[in-house]
Amino acid sequence: MVKYEDKISLYDAKGNLVAENVPLEAISPLYNPTIKSMLKNIKRTVAVNLADIENTLATGSIGGKGCKVPGRTLDLSVVSNAQAIADEVEKILKVSKDDDTAIKLINGGKQMAVQVPSERLEVAAEYSVSMLATAMALKEAIIKTFNVDMFEGSTVHASIMGNYPQVMDYAGGNIASLLGAPSNLEGLGYALRNIPVNHAVATTKKNMMNAIAFSSVMEQTATFEMGDAIGSFERQHLLGLAYQGLNADNLVIEFIKANGKGTVGTVVQSVVERALADGVIVVDKTMGSGFNMYKPADVNKWNAYAAAGLVAAAAVSCGAARAAQNIASVILYYNDILEYETGLPGVDYGRSMGTAVGFSFFSHSIYGGGGPGIFNGNHVVTRHSKGFAIPPVCAAMCADAGTQMFSPEHTSALVGAVYSAFDEFREPMKYVIERALNIKDKL
């Protein structure tokens, strides 16, 4: 069912036109088959680090930092027996002969991607079943493969699960998921926002447009779960996903190209010029000084144009530096300049600029406890702009040339290796657009 008259042109990650006059709802999480598939698979996919399990057992370093127990070591050739372990895990997890259980070994058996059968999620209240069922199946598989006795079973357990349940998550463990532990969520419906920037960047192999798309899909889909993208506010979030996340009408790439030798300020200029040309904003009145005050002809579309400009500003500024550290300042002052220039609200009606104030303090200023890449939409500092503030941070981390202490390679190697093996996670733009074209005439 088409609610909105909006039509968008879709472009690929390199700015090539794919299709015109596509209904806005074709990229909606409620209709788009790729987004639905991504959400289903993100809940049932678990990354396992078999190489680190082997090392953990060999050194007795169970439970994470500071938890080395020299007397509790096991010399097990986990990686060289990865196929046997994978076969046993699959056997344990399967519910029926033809279900969708899937096991994939990566990097010669050093890592393993486990997709639990959908039937297990259907009888669970939330997604923890994927991590827990995988962990217990893996533990049993290792015990069986190496004939581990009852006195060492707990050591195998700790090498997989880490410090849980002494801690709220799987700290020190060797399994991971993009969504993290639900016990760490900041509020109701925040699970899809609990994906660190570095995870998105690693999953998409530092491809900027795909990292932006991945982040935007997760952030904006979360707004449907949280009750934000409902009724009068649904169109705002769909336009944000289309223009900021999926480069609708090629806005993002055109803004970047036009300002390849520009600044955050020149990106603002491009956004205002394009919004005027497209009739998204109009001159409200001209002051005695000649300064124009504007008003939106379409306030939701103005927000979408501004959001597209924000990720372009991140690409221009952080790309010029080849460093991500200034992204909080980019988000803050892009919005500040935009508001002064137009008299209109910035991205997400001030919330992204407000987010950037705290983000700047906690990632860069007096405190500076963590680099931009470790933040997510569930973080107490960056949670406030729902859907619009995390994609530009992903753009910045893709442009970073290794300046960060908390780099994607450091924080997200396992997640990146496993989840990038799935096409729809690695190249979400391509597959969201493909399936949008499949359904556009059926809405």
From Swiss-Prot:
<dbReference type="GO" id="GO:0015948">
    <property type="term" value="P:methanogenesis"/>
</dbReference>
<dbReference type="InterPro" id="IPR015823">
    <property type="entry name" value="Me_CoM_Rdtase_asu_N_sub2"/>
</dbReference>
<feature type="binding site">
    <location>
        <position position="367"/>
    </location>
    <ligand>
        <name>coenzyme M</name>
    </ligand>
</feature>
<keyword id="KW-0808">Transferase</keyword>
<dbReference type="InterPro" id="IPR022679">
    <property type="entry name" value="Me_CoM_Rdtase_bsu_C"/>
</dbReference>
<dbReference type="GO" id="GO:0005737">
    <property type="term" value="C:cytoplasm"/>
</dbReference>
<comment type="similarity">
    <text>Belongs to the methyl-coenzyme M reductase beta subunit family.</text>
</comment>
<keyword id="KW-0484">Methanogenesis</keyword>
<dbReference type="InterPro" id="IPR008924">
    <property type="entry name" value="Me_CoM_Rdtase_asu/bsu_C"/>
</dbReference>
<dbReference type="InterPro" id="IPR003179">
    <property type="entry name" value="Me_CoM_Rdtase_bsu"/>
</dbReference>
<dbReference type="InterPro" id="IPR009024">
    <property type="entry name" value="Me_CoM_Rdtase_Fd-like_fold"/>
</dbReference>
<feature type="binding site">
    <location>
        <position position="369"/>
    </location>
    <ligand>
        <name>coenzyme B</name>
    </ligand>
</feature>
<dbReference type="Pfam" id="PF02783">
    <property type="entry name" value="MCR_beta_N"/>
</dbReference>
<comment type="subunit">
    <text>MCR is a hexamer of two alpha, two beta, and two gamma chains, forming a dimer of heterotrimers.</text>
</comment>
<keyword id="KW-0963">Cytoplasm</keyword>
<comment type="pathway">
    <text>One-carbon metabolism; methyl-coenzyme M reduction; methane from methyl-coenzyme M: step 1/1.</text>
</comment>
<comment type="function">
    <text>Component of the methyl-coenzyme M reductase (MCR) I that catalyzes the reductive cleavage of methyl-coenzyme M (CoM-S-CH3 or 2-(methylthio)ethanesulfonate) using coenzyme B (CoB or 7-mercaptoheptanoylthreonine phosphate) as reductant which results in the production of methane and the mixed heterodisulfide of CoB and CoM (CoM-S-S-CoB). This is the final step in methanogenesis.</text>
</comment>
<protein>
    <recommendedName>
        <fullName>Methyl-coenzyme M reductase subunit beta</fullName>
        <ecNumber>2.8.4.1</ecNumber>
    </recommendedName>
</protein>
<dbReference type="Pfam" id="PF02241">
    <property type="entry name" value="MCR_beta"/>
</dbReference>
<dbReference type="GO" id="GO:0050524">
    <property type="term" value="F:coenzyme-B sulfoethylthiotransferase activity"/>
</dbReference>
<dbReference type="InterPro" id="IPR022680">
    <property type="entry name" value="Me_CoM_Rdtase_bsu_N"/>
</dbReference>
